[in-house]
């Protein structure tokens, strides 16, 4: 009655074609969808530099201060896996600013113990994957 149907994985050409359609949807994506797209593209080594630089990274820059701690940690880890070290302005002006600025309350950001631990683990992961990035400022 219940013979399972084998799942056939497609080749990477199919995924590249799907990823080629993403630029027209990135601006309408929610923050968690952008980060999930980044994670999948990095894990499968899909997507062009144009998609990353002009669409995904642009969306992250606009919204990073609104991310939850979990979403921010996932972003840091995905960018570490990608080996994204070329843009120091992004790290200093946008990504590391998250630790200090909270636009929702208009003052310094505060974290619970678990959130601080999650951020610490993500920064250590970033430093291990990308030793060129100076993470002293957000950790102090």
Q: Would you name each region that the model predicts?
A:
Residues 1-140:
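Eukaryotic RNA-binding helical-repeat scaffolds
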